[in-house]
Amino acid sequence: MIKIKQYSKENEKVWDQFIENSKNPLFMFNRKYMEYHEDRFQDNSLMFYDENKLVALLPMNVRNDKLITHEGLTFGGFIESTNVKQHTINDCTSELISYAKGKGIKRIVYKHIPHMYHEQPSEEDIYALFLHGAQISKVEAATVINLRKPLKMPKGRKSQISRAKREGVVVKELNDHDDYCEFINLENRVLSEHYGATATHTGEEMALLHSRFPEHIHLYAAIYEYTIIAGAIVYEYGQVIHLQYLAADDKAREIGALDLVIAEAIEKYRPTKLWLDSGKSTEDDGRFLNEGLISQKESFGGRTNVYETLEIIF
């Protein structure tokens, strides 16, 4: 018999310990990551118990009449004990739907965890949601490099990497608070110029998250004439490197500085990781593909994996 308990602060230690020993021990599900922006979202995370034993967690927030997994995270979905099997997640999903209906929820928006982030197979949730009539509402194209068997880069990309080296660009990992703020300022200038947008995180927030998770969050910057002209904020998971942010100013694009950053990241993590996820190249819930952006990512040897969102409407 599955019972649901809504997460509260007193459960933080239990939550975090469960994450560490789950099929998906991803640091961004740690409460110290999830709660850095708790003022922006009404948290409604859930804990699932089977005969008083915790078997699954579900990071969620509520907005109006929707339960969403989770708007403050790249993706969410059930985080399962390694002992959990299909029938248990079927039961958890049934209880989730009953819980949602009891709260007057009209829609569950479910951003499931892409399979490359699983340390053990963990798609019981997709099958369980299918049984309850869930439909795909969003498909976003992300470009992923197989680090153990990368595809060849074209000559043009290699020449840009060589040019950056000739121009004296040096890639360094930076750790200071001010470095993160400087990089996010660069990111915002680029986003504003090309997309009329700003970064999801502020520089202060990224510096805070780095201080909380220094082994998982890294800033690699291209330095040219003592200035950051390009860089990447990298999230490091068990078998995946995710390029959370990429930015390059006009000079960096001219001399291949960001190309060098990405090339060095590939070489650095190739011995220990399986995948490099360079992120999504879609807009408008996946309906618009930025062909220039995805082409650039593909030129490093990446190909498409998708991020899917499912919905159940009551």
Please identify what each model-predicted range represents:
Residues 2-51, 55-66, 114-252:
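A conserved beta-strand-loop-helix scaffold within acyl/acetyltransferase catalytic domains
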Residues 41-43, 102-105, 217, 271-273:
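Short, high-confidence coil segments that cap the C-terminus of an alpha-helix
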Residues 49, 58, 73, 79, ...:
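Aromatic (often tryptophan-rich) hydrophobic motifs at membrane interfaces
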Residues 63-79:
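A short glycine/small-residue-enriched secondary-structure motif
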Residues 64, 93-100, 130-131:
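Short, charged beta->alpha transition segments
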Residues 101, 130, 165, 270, ...:
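Anion (oxyanion) recognition and catalysis
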Residues 105-113:
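Divalent metal-dependent hydrolysis catalytic cores, especially in the metallo-beta-lactamase
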Residues 112-115, 280-281:
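Short, well-ordered beta-to-alpha junction loops that form the rim of enzyme active sites
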